Amino acid sequence: MLSPSHLAVCVATLQDIKLFNNNLDVVDDAFEYLMSKAQKGEKGQYFTPRYVIDMCVKMMNPTVGDKIIDTACGSSGFTVHSIFKVWKDIRREKGLPEGEGFTAAQRIPEETNFVRDNVFAIDFDEKTVRVARTLNLIAGDGQTNVLHLNTLDYSRWNEITKQDDWNDTYNEGFKKLKKLQPKSSSDYSRFQFDLVMANPPFAGDIKENTIISRYELGRSPIGKWQNKVSRDILFIERNLNFLKATVETIYEAMKAVEEEVY
């Protein structure tokens, strides 16, 4: 926690730095610096290069009607890039200047409605979520749906979301996320998103039986539950369950699934 005097020094240093009307690379680099290399490496967290994110967004081509989520959001690059892309489409269709991604200019209702209702992100690391929420606010969404949850361990979501501190920060976004479950599911195992763009953490195995037993990829080739499963393997199944049946998921730099499972 910064003391008032230290905070004053920080503000004095940063006050002349231009954040608005800037590109994502500059702002995101500043926030990635807040996450130490040691901390990211221990948890398998590595921020996806912005040019890779830009390529994925262009390939997936999100539109104003799409529901979008990043299930391992890190600094929320996939969702912020998607927001900027759709905003440009909206403004182009209305004959308005496309403008900058990061800007202090007021957004038109169609832009804010898209972000408020369609764009979500989840991460298990609280500090990373704070960075992602801040980036979303700087981007101009005004109200972020970035949630601090463990995507894989969804059986504990009810327990987590009942905590007062969690509710104060995330409840509004979580209520909107719950509405995207199919009518046949109420345990957070399935959702109805159009697009999932994610770069899940690769480091470490999941060893908790309560998590592994909820995934078909937690079984061995002969059908027995495994004692441990690579985290990114479980993310494959989990992300597919976030999607409607007819759409695709992008994983950048994924290892060969067969090598990981077998």
Kindly give the residue locations of the regions a language model identified.
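Long recognition/docking surfaces used for binding and targeting
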Residues: 1-37
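Proline-centered turn/helix-capping motifs that create local helix->coil transitions or kinks
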Residues: 19-23, 91, 201-210
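Conserved phosphate/pyrophosphate-binding and hydrolysis machinery centered on Walker-type P-loop NTPases
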Residues: 20, 24, 46-50, 229
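Glycine-rich, acidic and aromatic/proline-enriched surface loops and short helix-turn segments
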Residues: 36, 84, 202, 245
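Conserved S-adenosyl-L-methionine
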Residues: 45-175, 187, 191, 195, ...
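A mobile, often basic/glycine-rich helix-loop segment
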Residues: 161-162, 166-184, 207-227, 257-261
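Conserved Class I SAM-dependent methyltransferase catalytic core
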Residues: 224-262
